[in-house]
Amino acid sequence: NRHIKVWNLSLGTSIDSSLDDFSDFGMALDNIQDENNVLIIKSAGNCTNFTRQLPKSRIAQSADSVRSVVVGSLAHAKGPYDYAEVDAPSPFTRIGPGPGSIVKPDVVFYGGNAGMNAGKLEKTGIKSFSIDGTPAYNVGTSFSTPWVSRMAAELTHLVKEEFDPLLIRALLIHNAKYPANNSMSMTDKVTQMGFGAPSSVQEMLYNSEDEITLILRDTLEKGSFIEMFDFPFPESLVDKDGNFVGQIIVTLVTKSLLDDKQAGEYCQSNIDILFGTYETETDRDTSKKGIKNPKGLEEPQNILLESLYSARVKGAHPFTGFERECTLVKYGKKFHPVKKYAIDLSEMTTSNRQRYCLLYTSDAADEEDSV
């Protein structure tokens, strides 16, 4: 059934994923997706640690699949004995990070709530149906995952192009947000909710009158990069002093080179993205080795850095639900196949922002990497 491009996988193991090595199950799922050009939406797994007042278990083996969109669970409601508040991670949902510190789960959606009453498990379930087709209620990441699978399938149907799993993953993650009423630290948000809960498909495909979305798709050879000068920016987002304002969300999803013989270094390529200001354009000597672009940048500055923003402004934007704190995710030197940044230009501590450029750089152990 290779014509079926989106697959829901609401099953897994009860064994925690390693912090260092990727599981055979997870790597097999990656291989299936590469060989068949399909996308698997995979449950993060459940744990019962909350029934014994223990910390949550990490994602199950198989949920460490790099290519899959791994889904955790949020509480949709709160019963009298449930532990989680509405829009908080469900008590049973497994958490990240994945091996090599990659962000897993990728996203979350509603999968129910649970708690204990005098030693008895109490559940507030999601409506589903049983084998005989009758309505049923239950909890688990097995029930949050199909919601995201449906979104992925709908996107596939509505995007009138050849199926591209990278594009579907990017749309889901780019349009994911953290619940505005959640007060968890940024570290806990990423660990338990990945990049957040995806918006509706209509919101993913059709911007509001206050938004613009650019999608860039290309393949980079080892050691190469792509530069964009004078990045397009609406005049309405330039204030009376000539400074840029507004929110920027940047999502980078790559088809990393994978090598199942390299244990914790399973991801063999990395792409970084820099977005920022520069002083002037300069001429470059293309006769020199490695220089292909006759134009270069003088004093470029990456604005996707925590140090450029005020720590005093916190919380969600009142209209968009936008969370600046995404900027605080530090990817370090690890190879991350998915990276997301969210910034609010009004919170910058420096005022001279005249132009923006976009720069991709590739650091690969092999020949090329898709983005």
Each model region followed by its residue ranges:
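Single conserved hydrophobic/aromatic residue that forms the stacking wall/gate
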Residues: Y360-D369
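Extended charged low-complexity segments that act as oligomerization/scaffolding linkers
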Residues: N1, T51, Y81-A88, K104-P105, ...
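Secreted peptidase-domain scaffold signal
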Residues: K189-E281
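Extended low-complexity, serine/threonine- and proline-enriched intrinsically disordered segments
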Residues: Q247-G321
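An often Trp-containing, charged/polar helix-loop segment at the C-terminal end
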Residues: V159-M184
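Substrate-binding/access-modulating region of protease and related hydrolase catalytic domains
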Residues: N1-S65, P135-V139, F143-T145
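Short glycine/serine- and small hydrophobic-enriched flexible loop segments
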Residues: F109, S149-L158, H174
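Extracellular S/T/G-rich loop segment that most often corresponds to the catalytic His/Ser-adjacent loop
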Residues: R58-S149
